């Protein structure tokens, strides 16, 4: 299976996917750690793909999304963005709305605490 096929399969078979450096339990870069941390704190169930484990996936995901950086978050097959975008969406409440619209379970109280802490 090609890297593109693997990426497409992963994105379509999981409601929420984070392509990241490292894993959700052991991130290996600050940006990946931040996004995984937000998702974990909000109680979101997500698949993590360690791009450091496969060079084909690492390069392929950048082509698949036409986005040059890692991490990359996908919700219901759609590319959401990287660390800066996910952070902005978390603080504005847009990420909550995206999860709600797509039937993704998350802890609303935790999301509110993130916003309160960063106000």
Sequence positions of predicted segments:
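Acidic/histidine-enriched, glycine/proline-rich intrinsically disordered or flexible terminal extensions
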Residues: 101-119
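N-terminal leader/targeting and pre-domain segments
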Residues: 1-17, 114-119
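Non-catalytic, surface beta->alpha helical segment in thiol-disulfide oxidoreductase systems
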Residues: 75-107
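Local sequence-structure signature of Cys/Sec-based thiol-disulfide redox active-site neighborhoods
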Residues: 7-45
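TIR-domain catalytic/interaction hotspot
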Residues: 5, 58-63
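Thiol-based oxidoreductase modules, predominantly thioredoxin-like and allied folds used
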Residues: 40-59, 67-68
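Structured beta-strand/turn binding interfaces of compact recognition modules in eukaryotic regulators
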Residues: 19-21, 52-54, 76
